[in-house]
């Protein structure tokens, strides 16, 4: 898959943004993640990262930012601005399926991730000037398998987000709908 990444990045210019919505490295600690961060840094464009569920090396935003190569930015409960685009995000959590029984721990994590996303969106809004666009990053899909609205999509509506980039899903079978439009917002599966 790394060759596919390199091939896809050939269309990216140095002034473009490359958004990586989590699962950045299989490393278990920050030192082991540095080669992967350098690999990402060597790709064209300005890179923005958010944490995924397999990023065990990502213990805290301060330690992550301390080792990031030039041109690579990490967001967690905050946002970063490039010209007229503000990028914000959070890891998110699994959105429940209709009529599914949710575990108490899942409810707790989902609620916490909603708060984190709202903090990030608030930060983004505070960085915005007239005409700026907000792009949100979330590792987990912000909706269930039926693409139903969720508390995450409601937050994106509330903050007038222009687009959302998400990941987490693996394999070709889940890539049937890589772009979904909901309530005027485009959601991109990366």
Identify the residue ranges that each predicted region occupies.
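Core catalytic region of metal-dependent phosphoesterases/phosphodiesterases
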Residues: 1-83, 150-161, 183-185, 189
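Short, flexible micro-motifs
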Residues: 25, 55, 92, 169-170
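Conserved catalytic scaffold of divalent metal-dependent phosphoesterases
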Residues: 58-148, 155
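Histidine-centered catalytic micro-motifs
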Residues: 136-143, 162-173
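Acidic, low-complexity terminal tails and accessory targeting/binding regions
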Residues: 166-186, 190
């Amino acid at each position: 898959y790394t060759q596919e990444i390199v091939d896809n990045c050939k269309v990216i210019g140095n002034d473009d943004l490359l958004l990586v919505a989590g699962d950045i490295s299989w490393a278990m600690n920050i030192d082991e993640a540095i080669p992967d961060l350098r690999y990402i840094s060597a790709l064209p464009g300005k890179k923005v990262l958010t944490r995924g569920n397999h990023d065990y090396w990502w213990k805290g935003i301060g330690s992550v930012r301390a080792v990031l190569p030039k041109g690579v930015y990490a967001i967690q409960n905050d946002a970063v601005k490039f010209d007229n685009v503000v990028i914000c995000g959070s890891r998110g959590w699994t959105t429940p399926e209709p009529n599914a029984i949710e575990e108490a721990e899942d409810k707790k994590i989902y609620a916490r991730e909603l708060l984190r996303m709202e903090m990030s969106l608030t930060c983004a809004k505070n960085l915005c000037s007239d005409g700026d666009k907000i792009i949100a990053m979330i590792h987990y899909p912000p909706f269930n398998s039926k693409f139903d609205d969720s508390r995450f999509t409601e937050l994106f509506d509330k903050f007038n987000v222009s687009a959302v980039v998400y990941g987490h899903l693996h394999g070709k079978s889940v890539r049937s709908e890589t772009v979904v439009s909901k309530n005027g917002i485009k959601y991109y599966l990366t």
